[in-house]
């Protein structure tokens, strides 16, 4: 089965690579329109997936990731339209010039070819990834989680209908609908057809891909994100940022998981934090230094376990640790962070600059929420992933991250001396 999918994707990629920006945008507009026109079939499939997931004991955080609503589906369609409005990087000349030999040389952006994406219970990923791949002239093979099998099948069927109505092969966007995990291992060895692989899931999936894939892998998406509250932070303003970073949508990878509080502000900050977190129904996992003071407040508090500093909760849980100073905070982030998104809240711009320079994450913020690490927020349109590695792409992966380049030399029967 996968062999045939690979052949179809590779053949489709050749055709996609030749499309003009106008032709690609016409396809995307058709997909957006069809997602809305056929929303009932997608929402019905999603309702079945959610019901099965709830019956199987999936957590509320995971159910939130899985669930589609009419408003969310409308937002997904609008994201596709936003991709239409983005500049097409394919064909851009990055640099070039004329050599001493007279050869005119240029470096031009081109599609990667075929992208493989493995992801879990996030039905929006199906459309986000497909739209970005099509905009950049790439074919894509999707392997979603078993929890979203009906939703993904219904969504891909809509996309393929739109492709065919525009005269393009259905092989441009395909999904592996068989939940057999052995197919993941088989997919990881499809280097004959797939040019880049992007896993979007937990640490286990990333480890599997790194160890078994014969395809170049872009890893990321695991977000143990931190906010450091410096001693000069404005408490009321800091709490607004923390509430946003923790509660706006707890199941996302850019949600804060650990709060580091400077010891010199702890006495005034912790009572205010407890009150605010109680109102937001957040459970605090406190270290020894913060435990007694937080237990005196209204928030639910438990003693933090050492391993929880490495956990991506994806829920209304927040670690709280007292640190001696900025050095202590940076050391903690280096040990426990995942190089995703980290922030400092401070009025001391020297400390802010040190934090920016010394915290080696894909996104670093000063006096802002970690929730901004998102392709849409960055103006990139829908994102294919958030890369936490350093090669090829880093941070939210938009259109340019799905391209490579080729060197083009134009001469007049020019030969090398």
Curated annotation (Swiss-Prot):
GO terms for cellular component: cytoplasm. Pathway: Amino-acid biosynthesis; L-proline biosynthesis; L-glutamate 5-semialdehyde from L-glutamate: step 2/2. GO terms for biological process: L-proline biosynthetic process. InterPro entries: Ald_DH/histidinol_DH, Ald_DH_C, Ald_DH_N, Aldehyde_DH_dom, G-glutamylP_reductase_CS, Glu-5-SA_DH, GPR_dom. One of its GO terms (molecular function) is NADP binding. The keyword Cytoplasm applies. Gene3D superfamilies: Aldehyde Dehydrogenase, Chain A, domain 1, Aldehyde Dehydrogenase, Chain A, domain 2. CDD domains: ALDH_F18-19_ProA-GPR. Catalyzes the NADPH-dependent reduction of L-glutamate 5-phosphate into L-glutamate 5-semialdehyde and phosphate. The product spontaneously undergoes cyclization to form 1-pyrroline-5-carboxylate. This is Gamma-glutamyl phosphate reductase. It comes from Escherichia coli O127:H6 (strain E2348/69 / EPEC).
């Amino acid at each position: 089965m996968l062999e045939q999918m690979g052949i179809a994707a590779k053949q489709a990629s050749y055709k996609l690579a030749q499309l003009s920006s106008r032709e690609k945008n016409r396809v995307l507009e058709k997909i957006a329109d069809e997602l809305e026109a056929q929303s009932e079939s997608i929402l019905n499939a999603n309702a079945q997936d959610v019901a099965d997931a709830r019956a199987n004991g999936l957590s509320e955080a995971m159910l939130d990731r899985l669930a589609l609503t009419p408003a969310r589906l409308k937002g997904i369609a609008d994201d596709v339209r936003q991709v239409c409005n983005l500049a097409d990087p394919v064909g851009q000349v990055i640099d070039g010039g004329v050599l001493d030999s007279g050869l005119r040389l240029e470096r031009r952006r081109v599609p990667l070819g075929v992208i493989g994406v493995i992801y879990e219970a996030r039905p929006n990923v199906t459309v986000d990834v497909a739209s970005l791949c099509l905009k950049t002239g790439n074919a894509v093979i999707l392997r979603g989680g078993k929890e979203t099998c009906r939703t993904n099948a219904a969504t891909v069927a809509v996309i393929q209908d739109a492709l065919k109505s525009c005269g393009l092969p259905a092989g441009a966007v395909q999904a592996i609908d068989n939940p057999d995990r052995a197919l993941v291992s088989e997919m990881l060895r499809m280097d004959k057809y797939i040019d880049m692989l992007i896993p979007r899931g937990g640490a286990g999936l990333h480890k599997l891909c790194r160890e078994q894939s014969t395809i170049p892998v872009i890893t990321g998406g695991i977000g143990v994100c931190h906010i450091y509250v410096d001693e000069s932070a404005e408490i009321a303003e800091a709490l607004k940022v923390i509430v946003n970073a923790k509660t706006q949508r707890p199941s996302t990878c850019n949600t804060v998981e650990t709060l580091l509080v400077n010891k010199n502000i702890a006495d005034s900050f912790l009572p205010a934090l407890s009150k605010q977190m109680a109102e937001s129904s957040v459970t605090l996992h406190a270290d020894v230094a913060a435990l007694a003071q937080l237990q005196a407040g209204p928030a639910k508090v438990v003693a933090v376990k050492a391993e929880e500093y490495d956990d991506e909760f994806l829920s209304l849980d927040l670690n709280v640790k007292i640190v001696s100073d900025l050095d202590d905070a940076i050391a903690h982030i280096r040990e426990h962070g995942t190089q995703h998104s980290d922030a400092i809240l401070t009025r001391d711009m020297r400390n802010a600059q040190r934090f920016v320079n010394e915290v080696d994450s894909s996104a670093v913020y000063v006096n802002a929420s970690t929730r901004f690490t998102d392709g849409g927020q960055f103006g990139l349109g829908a994102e294919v992933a958030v890369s936490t590695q350093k090669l090829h792409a880093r941070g939210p992966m938009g259109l340019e991250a799905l391209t490579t380049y080729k060197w083009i030399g134009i001469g007049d029967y020019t030969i090398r001396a």
